[in-house]
Amino acid sequence: FVNDNSNIYESSTLATVAIALIPIILWFMRHGTIFPPDRRVRAFGGALIFACLLIPVGTEARTGLVCIAVLGLLMLRDVKNRMMYLLAAGAVGVMALPFLPASYYERMATLGSVESDQSASTRMQVWSWTLDYAAENPLGGGFDAYRGNEFTYRLPVTREEGGALVTEIENVTDSGRAYHSSFFEMLGEQGWPGLIMWLALHALGLLQMERIRRRWRDREAPAEQWQGPLASALQFANIIYLVGASFQGIAYQPVFLMLIGLQIALSTYCAKHDS
């Protein structure tokens, strides 16, 4: 029996993981040692990146589109020719538009319609409930505390009557809805102390990777060329995770705990190297 559930089966989680891995794939294409960089490695890495970019399209995950946009902005920092990068990214985006399915456009269009989208409306209500819950329970309610929530909100509902579309505002009651945000997930389950520790864990990792990137970027020794780019790749992956985590409850996602572990390992290696 093979358990194929790697905890990334949900569409938004899968899209976030895929986009977060792209900077690390790029690093392996340039600095890998198991498969030294050559034409075949670059071709395989390029195909893998293309597959990662297709995942948000196939899953129609709005979070994936946001993560792609964030990755595009982050990579501006490290590219040598920013103008060429912007032109190439724009050209690829324009060429891809005709191949996207109509359902993808319809799904992405809901990004700007919070009031009419039930998913977005539910998230806002859950977040509001979590803030109230944390005010009464500052130490949190433990795992799955969201199962105790219940709220009523107003939502436009469109239905066909007599051959015409009629939109009415209806009261919708919901209960036991998930947090749809790792920040609120930590707040509701672990309280303010847990949220602060979780934020500190990621903030310290980002700051440490930035410190390593700056200290190692100008080194010229052949054995000192991979540390700075790896710190940058891990930093980008962490930022993309935090962006994706803003819209889904993946605070305990193992993939990103592994990412934290890689940051700790790199930091320890660099500290010993310089000591």
Which sequence ranges carry the predicted segments?
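Alpha-helical membrane and juxtamembrane elements of multi-pass inner-membrane transport
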Residues: V2, V41, Q118, M124, ...
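Membrane interfacial helix motifs at helix-loop boundaries and amphipathic/re-entrant anchors
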Residues: F1-D4, Y105-G112, Y252
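A membrane-periplasm/extracellular boundary helix in multi-pass inner-membrane enzymes
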Residues: F50, L54-T59, D78-Q118, S128-A135, ...
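Transmembrane signal-anchor hairpin modules in multi-pass inner-membrane enzymes, especially those
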Residues: M29-A43, K80-N81, Q225-G228, T268-S275
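Hydrophobic transmembrane alpha-helices and their immediate junctions
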Residues: E189-N238, L262-Q263, T268
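Extracellular/periplasmic helix-loop-helix junctions in multi-pass membrane proteins
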Residues: G249-M258
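Long extracytoplasmic/lumenal interhelical loops at the membrane interface
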Residues: G112-S128, L139-Q190, R213-E220
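Alpha-helical transmembrane segments of multi-pass inner-membrane proteins
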Residues: F1, S6-D78, L86-G93, F99, ...
